[in-house]
Amino acid sequence: MKKIHLSILFLILAYTTYAQQGKPKLVVGIIVDQMRDEYIDRFYDDFGNDGFKRLIREGYRMKNFHFNYMPTYTAPGHSSVYTGTTPRYHGIVGNNYYLRQEHKEIYCTDDETVSILGPGDPNAGKMSPSRLKSTTVTDELKLSTNLRGKVIGMSIKDRAAILPAGHFADWAFWMNSDGQFISSTYYGDKLPKWVDDFNNKKYYESYLKKNWTPLKDPKEYDESLTDKNPYEGKLNYRIDPVFPIDLYSEYIKNGAGIIKVTPWGNSILADLAMAAIENEDLGQDDNTDFLAISFSSTDYVGHALDHVLWNFRICIFDWILQLASFSISLTKK
C-alpha cells in the first residue's frame, strides 16, 4: 500500500491529521467549509468507522488551534490555513476588498492577464493566486522537491481551489455555473484531457436525478430544529429547503450549477479528486505530491440555512458518508 498522508483542515478552528511513518507519497489536505470543531462532538454518533472516527482513532485532534484575525471568509480562511499566517501578511483580507493601490474593489483571485481553460463564462476563468503575498505549504513543498512534487488544488469555488494550491501549483480546478470544472492559463495552455473527459461524462446528471431525501428518520435529528420552520432561507435563493427536494426538476429549470448547494457538490468533487490521483499519477514516485481539496457545499447550505437547522445537519451527515467512501478509496490506492 502506498503511503498516503490524509489531513483534514477544519475551516478554521481545528486541524486533524492521519499520520503515517516516514515520507509520504501523497498528502491530501481537506478543508470543509463551515465545519466547526464542535461538530465532531455534536455529530459524533453519525460518524461511521471509516470517516472521522478513523481520523480521530488513528490520527491527532488539535483542539486549541487559532488564527487571530477576522473576518473568517472563505478566501482569508483558506489562505491563513495554507500559509500559516494572518491576512496582514498573506494579503488576502476578504473575498472582495478595496485595494488602495488600484483605487477599486477587487476580487481575491481575479487576474486580467490570464484566460479561461474550459467551457463557460470567460470571466470565470480569469483567476490566479497572484494577489497572495506569502508562500503556502504547497509552495514550500514544490521548492523542497525542486518543483518535482506535483501540487493540485480543487474545489467547486475558485478561491478555495486556487489559494491553497499556491503560486507554483501544477493545476487548480473549480466549477463553473454549469457544473463543469475549469481552470486558467496561469496553469497551462489547455485543460488536461482527463478533465475534459470528466466534464463530458456529466457526472452531475446522475447525482441530480436523485431526490434529496434524509438518510435517517427525521426524528433522529433531535439536536437540530425541525424541517420547514421560519428561520430557514432558500437554497440558491429560490429553492424551499423542505424535504424531499426534487433536484432533477431544478436541474431542468436552472441548470447543473444547482449541484453546488447539495451534498453531491462534494461527491462530484471527490470523483474529480480520484480522477486526478489516477490520471496525474499522484503518489507514484519518491517525490511527495499534494492534493488540496476544499469541500464547499456545506458553506452554500450553511449560508442559505443555519447551523441549528436539520437541513444543515443532513448536509454534514451526507458529507461524512462521502468522506468515509473517499478515505476507503484513498487507502486502496
Question: Could you tell me what each predicted segment is?
Answer:
Residues 1-23:
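Bacterial Sec-dependent N-terminal signal peptides
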Residues 23-28, 58-62, 89, 146-151, ...:
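Loop/turn elements at helix/coil->beta-strand transitions in domains of secreted/extracellular proteins
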Residues 36-42, 65-67, 122-129, 256-263, ...:
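Second-shell loop/turn segments in exported
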Residues 40-89, 150-154:
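Short, structured active-site-proximal loop/turn typified by the sulfatase FGly-forming signature C/S-X-P-X-R
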Residues 86, 94-286, 296-303:
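His/Asp/Glu-rich, glycine-adjacent segments
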Residues 301, 308, 324-325:
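Terminal, contiguous helix-loop blocks that mediate binding/assembly
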Residues 318-333:
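Metal-dependent active-site segment of extracytoplasmic phospho-/sulfohydrolases and closely related
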